[in-house]
């Protein structure tokens, strides 16, 4: 896991995540750890971050969808990023978080091992992802270089395929 936690989920203010000016969010990423790898998603896609909570399983959901949560009256499907990446399932702990994002006007939560920080990454420090056969389905959209660290940048809208999205949310992507 991360040796230094720059910001914990409880330290990221709701104001920072509530529909700020999009120009202020350009080039900013919420970084998180999953299976010892550092990932990032555009902060513009993030609605909020919540601690791990009870997930209600739903029959016939895709293998990586853990189920649904009730978040202040809203029913939100949650996906385990580890499972989506084809990694082994891990036990959740006090650092496990759910990153709630908005995809096509529906909220979707992503379970991650640990939230790291909100980071600005200049476009000139982002390289295209390596070409891999099978696997990522295009959701790894770039590789950010930060000092001695590498951040795999993900597009939350591509983590879930169109058919899976419709099954999870009842909407067509």
Tell me the role of every PLM-derived stretch:
Residues 1-173:
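An acidic, low-aromatic, low-complexity terminal/linker signal
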